[in-house]
């Protein structure tokens, strides 16, 4: 592993209804970046916020000699789509992603940059003393285990978005045009050298988590379908096993009927109904998984954009865009020679 020279650092932060957190987020993130011996930009992607977040981001970007870049999406597309929009607009040799809720400290940015300079393609983080509820922690552990087995990359916390990516990894992810993606997994599929570090995890001080139960379910399906096609293979195995169990159980029912007569279980009606419901449920599970894959393939075949950037604001210069492929030379904040 060879050292990786870094001249310019980009920070990408997706924002959705974080009006109360933004002033502290902007202050702490800029202060952390000023500790770097590199030029930097802080790309803030507004993911269709309905509060005052958009106005706050634009004012920050319009400030004279501002290191902030405001990327305004026309509606809410989700956290990972917003990060990809930030990836398209940033130009750093290393790109760091960070959540806007301040549960992960921006002060860790210099440490991640130093690790990236050592030659790591991806620098992940593990939340120590995680301050989420148990119903969020346990599913996360199961997902991390499933991802490790599917990708072969042993990382312990795929849910923590405080991460550093080498430019080549970011470019590789941008070349992937699928609509449903999970960035940490996608990055690790291209990375050769990865590492993880422990970071603090604070309680959310303002607002609530933007991951509702339905969003978590959608995220789970994104994880399943972007990692592997193994569930499709499992369908045939499960179907064969269920059919075999059905035959054996039917034979058992016949034997019991011959021995004890038809009255032993209500003429067998309730047992047959139970068996019918079990196997029907299994079929619907399989059909649902198959439908998820087909639906996502349909979305990819249509080749619609994953997001639409309404406006880009950088250093008092709002730039309207007509497509997601608009390119603007990034503002380079000269905080160090």
Swiss-Prot record:
Primary site of residence: membrane
Subcellular location: Cell inner membrane
Entry keywords, A to Z: Antibiotic resistance, Cell inner membrane, Cell membrane, Glycosyltransferase, Lipid A biosynthesis, Lipid biosynthesis, Lipid metabolism, Lipopolysaccharide biosynthesis, Membrane, Transferase, Transmembrane, Transmembrane helix
Keyword Nucleotide-binding found: no
Any GO BP annotation: 4-amino-4-deoxy-alpha-L-arabinopyranosyl undecaprenyl phosphate biosynthetic process
Pfam families in alphabetical order: Glycos_transf_2
Transmembrane segments annotated in the record for this chain: 235-255, 270-290
A GO cellular-component term linked to this record: plasma membrane
Reactions that this protein is recorded to catalyse: UDP-4-deoxy-4-formamido-beta-L-arabinose + di-trans,octa-cis-undecaprenyl phosphate = 4-deoxy-4-formamido-alpha-L-arabinopyranosyl di-trans,octa-cis-undecaprenyl phosphate + UDP
GO molecular function: phosphotransferase activity, for other substituted phosphate groups; undecaprenyl-phosphate 4-deoxy-4-formamido-L-arabinose transferase activity
Topology of this chain in the membrane: Multi-pass membrane protein
Pathway assigned in UniProt: Glycolipid biosynthesis; 4-amino-4-deoxy-alpha-L-arabinose undecaprenyl phosphate biosynthesis; 4-amino-4-deoxy-alpha-L-arabinose undecaprenyl phosphate from UDP-4-deoxy-4-formamido-beta-L-arabinose and undecaprenyl phosphate: step 1/2; Bacterial outer membrane biogenesis; lipopolysaccharide biosynthesis
Family the UniProt entry places it in: Belongs to the glycosyltransferase 2 family.
Database matches in NCBIfam families: PRK10714.1
Protein name stated in the entry: Undecaprenyl-phosphate 4-deoxy-4-formamido-L-arabinose transferase
Organism of origin: Pseudomonas syringae pv. syringae (strain B728a)
Taxonomic placement: Bacteria, Pseudomonadati, Pseudomonadota, Gammaproteobacteria, Pseudomonadales
């Amino acid at each position: 592993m060879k050292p990786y020279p870094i001249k310019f650092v980009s920070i990408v932060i997706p924002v959705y209804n974080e009006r109360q957190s933004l002033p502290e987020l902007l202050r702490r993130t800029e202060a952390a970046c000023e500790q770097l011996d590199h030029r930097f930009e802080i790309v803030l992607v507004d993911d269709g916020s309905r509060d005052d977040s958009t106005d706050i981001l634009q004012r920050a970007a319009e400030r004279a000699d501002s290191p902030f870049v405001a990327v305004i999406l026309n509606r809410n597309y989700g956290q990972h789509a917003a990060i990809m929009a930030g990836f398209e607009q940033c130009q750093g040799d290393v790109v760091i992603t960070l959540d806007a809720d301040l549960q992960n400290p921006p002060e860790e940015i210099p440490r991640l940059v130093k690790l990236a300079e050592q030659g790591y393609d991806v620098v992940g983080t593990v939340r120590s003393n995680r301050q989420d509820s148990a119903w969020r922690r346990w599913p996360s552990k199961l997902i991390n285990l499933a991802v490790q087995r599917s990708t072969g990359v042993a990382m312990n916390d795929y849910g923590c978005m405080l991460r550093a990516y080498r430019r080549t990894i970011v470019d590789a992810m941008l070349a992937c045009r699928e609509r449903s993606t999970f960035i940490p997994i996608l990055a690790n599929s291209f990375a050769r050298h990865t590492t993880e570090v422990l970071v603090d995890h604070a309680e959310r001080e303002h607002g609530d988590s933007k991951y509702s139960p339905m969003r978590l379910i959608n995220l789970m399906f994104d994880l399943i379908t972007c990692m592997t096609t193994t569930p499709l293979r499992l369908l045939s195995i499960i179907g064969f096993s269920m059919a075999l169990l059905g035959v054996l159980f039917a034979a058992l029912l016949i034997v019991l009927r011959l021995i004890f007569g038809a009255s032993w279980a209500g003429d067998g009606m309730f047992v047959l109904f139970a068996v019918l419901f079990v196997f029907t449920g299994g079929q619907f599970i399989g059909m649902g998984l198959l439908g998820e894959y087909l639906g996502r393939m349909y979305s990819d075949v249509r080749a619609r954009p994953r997001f639409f950037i309404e406006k880009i604001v950088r250093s008092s210069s709002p730039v309207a865009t007509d497509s997601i492929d608009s390119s603007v030379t990034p503002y380079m904040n000269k905080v160090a020679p």
